[in-house]
Structures are given as C-alpha cells and as structure tokens.
Amino acid sequence: MSFVAYEELIKEGDTAILSLGHGSMVAVRVQRGAQTQTRHGVLRHSVDLIGRPFGSKVICSRGGWVYVLHPTPELWTVNLPHRTQILYSTDIALITMMLELRPGSVVCESGTGSGSVSHAIIRSVAPTGHLHTVEFHQQRADKAREEFQEHRLSQWVTVHTQDVCCSGFGVVHVADAVFLDIPSPWEAVGHAWDALKVEGGRFCSFSPCIEQVQRTCQALAAHGFTELSTLEVLPQVYNVRTVSLPLPDLGANNLETNMGSDASPFRSGTPMKETVGHTGYLTFATKTPG
C-alpha cells in the first residue's frame, strides 16, 4: 500500500481507512493478530482485512459492516492524529494548483506539523519529484518520519529538524515551489528566496491573521518577489431543487391562454445558510529569473 500508487489487496503493515457510516471514518494500521473495536463489533485484521481487496464490505462481529478504503491524502487529512492544527483539502487544493505542482517538482515546506499538506504535496510531485519539509519540534519531526515510512513515502521526502527562520530549508536553489505554514513567515522569506531555483519559482504562505499577511507581503516585496496575491477560500453549499411557480392571472382577455398553459417546473439553486467559516489567508508570489 502506498499513498502514491493504488494497490488492490490489503497487506500486513498497510494503513486502511474504515468507513463506519455517514461521516464516520477511522484509520487503522493493519497487523496480523490485531483487532479493532468499532460500534458495529470487532474487526479481526488477520481474518477480516489481510488478503481482501480495498473497497471490500466487511461484516463485523455484531452483524454491522464497514467498508475498507484505500488511503489517499484527502482521507488521511480527515483521519490523521492531530499534533498541530492542520489545513484541509479545500485550502490544499488551491495551494497545489497555485504552486503549479506536478510530477518532478521539488518543493520546500515548513512546518511539517501533522503532515496533512505534506502527503498531498508528495502525491502531486511523485514519482520523480521530492519534498524537503522542515519541522523545528523534534518529537513532531520524528513522528512525521515514522508516518512517511509506514505509508511508504520516504523516498520522496526528507525531513529536516531545524528552525526555518534561522537555518533555512537545508537546500539552496533546488526548489520549484516553497510553502510556509509558520507563525512568522516573513522571517523565512529570505530563506525561501534562496531555496527556490535561480530561474524562479512559486511561493505560498498560510496565515490565519491579516496582520501576518501584511508583514509577509512587505518582506516578499523587499526580497524581489512579484505577482503578490492573497486569497481566502470559502466554499458555499447550494440547495438544488425543482420549483413550480403558479401562472400569473392575466385577466379575462387572456382566459384561453391561461387555460391552455401549464406551469413549467425548473431547477433552482439557493445558498444554504450553513457555510464554512474563515480558516486563513493564502498569500502567493513569484520569484522571477534574474
């Protein structure tokens, strides 16, 4: 099993996502002889998981069932153990697009945190790209290395344990893109410039507060970055339904027309009241050659 390449059968050591019902999932490490307790009963790894195809519907001990899903960065994001606050797929999708990530890209990232963005970046740059991710907290860095090893992603990622604001990314002029998710990104802008290739590259920073954005933009302009832009992603859910409106009364002179016409149903989309709130601002910039 790899987050980069799909495999059909579940093997010992794989990470599997158990779908327990609407909106309820859990990630498990498949181990021979192990058991997982769910609200539907016990799931025995040796009998119920190992050797079965991903996507199987598995009956638990109490008669309920779960679906065993192949892991993806998106599923991992909603099931990972939180060591820090994380970014979710809505923001990650825009980051991936605006940084122009593709197979073969080299990316520098800080901080690693819980690895939510890291998994998505690795999936985007594999099989010929690489991620250099920097985490100053030793225990979080060690845990990230362990997870990358378990998910068979180690060949595409190098974890550096250092303060990016003081020591940079550990590489110079190799990156096609840089992503920062740290409290003071403006202090690392100079290191981001040095990490990007001489011929240029893309920059992105995530910040919850507009004051952080202002200081980051000032630092970006001072270091020579161009095409600065800041975006906020706020998804809006729409309720789509079929509506039939009554025909208007056009008076006695139009009685025959009214009697011969039926109300035409049409589909209408109205925004739902519930909407996702503010997560943060995404600031993008470009290092141009020269």
UniProtKB/Swiss-Prot annotation:
Pfam families: GCD14
Keyword annotations of the record: Acetylation, Methyltransferase, Nucleus, Phosphoprotein, S-adenosyl-L-methionine, Transferase, tRNA processing
Name of the top EC class for this enzyme: transferase
GO cellular component: nucleus; tRNA (m1A) methyltransferase complex
Chain intervals for the UniProt region annotation (Substrate): 20-22, 35-42, 64-65, 85-89, 110-117, 180-183, 205-212
Compartment annotation: Nucleus
Residues annotated with Phosphoserine modification: 264
EC number annotated for this UniProt entry: 2.1.1.220, 2.1.1.-
GO biological process terms held by the UniProt record: mRNA processing; tRNA methylation
Cited InterPro entries: SAM-dependent_MTases_sf, TRM61_C, tRNA_MeTrfase_Gcd14
GO MF entries: mRNA (adenine-N1-)-methyltransferase activity; tRNA (adenine(58)-N1)-methyltransferase activity
Chain residues that bind S-adenosyl-L-methionine: 87, 114-116, 135, 140, 163-164, 181
UniProt modified residues of type N-acetylserine: 2
Residues binding substrate: 279
Catalytic activity: adenosine(58) in tRNA + S-adenosyl-L-methionine = N(1)-methyladenosine(58) in tRNA + S-adenosyl-L-homocysteine + H(+); an adenosine in mRNA + S-adenosyl-L-methionine = an N(1)-methyladenosine in mRNA + S-adenosyl-L-homocysteine + H(+)
Function (record text): Catalytic subunit of tRNA (adenine-N(1)-)-methyltransferase, which catalyzes the formation of N(1)-methyladenine at position 58 (m1A58) in initiator methionyl-tRNA. Catalytic subunit of mRNA N(1)-methyltransferase complex, which mediates methylation of adenosine residues at the N(1) position of a small subset of mRNAs: N(1) methylation takes place in tRNA T-loop-like structures of mRNAs and is only present at low stoichiometries.
Family: Belongs to the class I-like SAM-binding methyltransferase superfamily. TRM61 family.
Complexes and interactors: Heterotetramer; composed of two copies of TRMT6 and two copies of TRMT61A.
Protein name: tRNA (adenine(58)-N(1))-methyltransferase catalytic subunit TRMT61A
Lineage of the species this protein comes from: Eukaryota, Metazoa, Chordata, Craniata, Vertebrata
Gene: Trmt61a
